[in-house]
Curated annotation (Swiss-Prot):
Protein name, UniProt field: Nucleotide-binding protein RSc0403
Pfam families reported for this sequence: PapZ_C, RapZ-like_N
InterPro entries reported in the protein's UniProt record: P-loop_NTPase, RapZ-like, RapZ-like_N, RapZ_C
Family that this chain belongs to: Belongs to the RapZ-like family.
Keyword ATP-binding: yes
Record flagged with keyword ATP-binding: yes
NCBIfam families given in the database record: PRK05416.1 (NF003828)
Residues where GTP binds: D57, I58, R59, S60
Function noted in UniProt: Displays ATPase and GTPase activities.
Region (Disordered): 99-124
A GO term for molecular function: GTP binding
PANTHER family referenced in this protein's UniProt entry, alphabetically: RNASE ADAPTER PROTEIN RAPZ (PTHR30448:SF0)
Length: 296
């Protein structure tokens, strides 16, 4: 059975991810304590199910410490992947302001008194920012072994498309994610390796190329005619290829390689696509253009 375990920050898009899994034919359960997942997997396997999606988060915080042990147990019999969704504090504050919902940890002890509504909880409430940072600290041990997605700048449609791509591949040793981004919008927090290509010739200064992207042929032709661009792409390729076996030996399931230029529209997009084309011959590869997804 393939099992996708979704966890991460409240408000980061876990419900969206779980809905994508459900649409793809997964049997999905929200807010299931980790210790119950193996029993559920056995039951569903006996019933003929082949795909299970489970979301567990801070609402089940008493069981969060058991997640690593549960993952180890499940991997003895199943293909298990773990997805960790996160977002910046500013992005989460804005989302909570828009929805007017309360953060699970904004109430004293993380939950109201038994039988009372949240507003009746005794003791002072934790501020939203304090609750977010508290949750981030509590969940931090789960981020490293998971594939992380920073949804700070992702629209819902872009996140849905990314999740679809994430679950579409077959089991393998490692997934390579090549992600383009613009430094003026911040470095992706889910990146394992970051390469700065801002020193390369910039198509932005050609008025005919400015509205295009690194996936458009005129921009590709321009960049491919620049020796510096080809040399930079080759050096990054060689670095990733040289050290990829070390990441695999470290039992990594995912490696996110972020390529950044100024705006994330031309140079980084082109190089990310070029690297993805090369490494597809070596295994499973995903591509994400962060700023293009935002502008889509």
């Amino acid at each position: 059975m393939r099992i996708i375990l979704i966890t991460g920050m409240s408000g980061s898009g876990k419900s969206v991810a779980l809905n994508v899994l459900e649409d793809a034919g997964y049997y999905c359960v929200d807010n299931l304590p980790a210790q119950f997942i193996p029993e559920l997997a056995r039951y569903l396997a006996d019933q003929g199910y082949t795909h299970l999606g489970v979301a567990t988060d801070i609402r089940s915080r008493e069981s969060l410490r058991k997640v690593p042990e549960t993952i180890t147990q499940l991997r003895k019999e199943h293909d298990v992947r773990m997805l960790f969704l996160t977002a910046s504090t500013n992005a989460l504050v804005q989302r909570y302001s828009e929805t007017r919902r309360r953060h699970p940890l904004s109430i004293r002890n993380g939950r109201p008194d038994a039988g009372n509504p949240p507003s009746a909880a005794k003791g002072p409430d934790t501020s939203l920012i304090e609750a977010i940072e508290m949750e981030r600290e509590l969940l931090s041990p789960l981020a490293d072994p998971a594939h992380r997605i920073d949804t700070s700048t992702l629209r819902t449609n872009a996140l849905r498309a990314y999740i679809k791509e994430f679950i579409s591949d077959e089991p393998h040793d490692i997934t390579l994610m090549f992600e383009s981004f613009g430094f003026k919008h911040g470095v992706p927090t889910d990146a394992d390796l970051v390469f700065d290509v801002r020193s390369l010739p910039n198509p932005y200064y050609d008025t005919q190329l400015r509205p295009l992207t690194g996936r458009d042929q005129p921009v590709i032709d321009f960049l491919q005619s620049q020796p510096m661009v080809l040399a930079m792409a080759e050096d990054i390729r060689a670095y990733v290829e040289k050290w990829l076996p070390s990441f695999i030996a470290d039992n990594r399931s995912y490696l996110t390689v972020a390529i950044g230029c100024t705006g994330g529209q031309h140079r980084s997009v082109y190089i990310a696509e070029r690297l993805a084309t090369y490494f597809r011959a070596h295994g499973n590869v995903l591509v994400r253009h962060r700023e293009l997804a935002v502008d889509a």
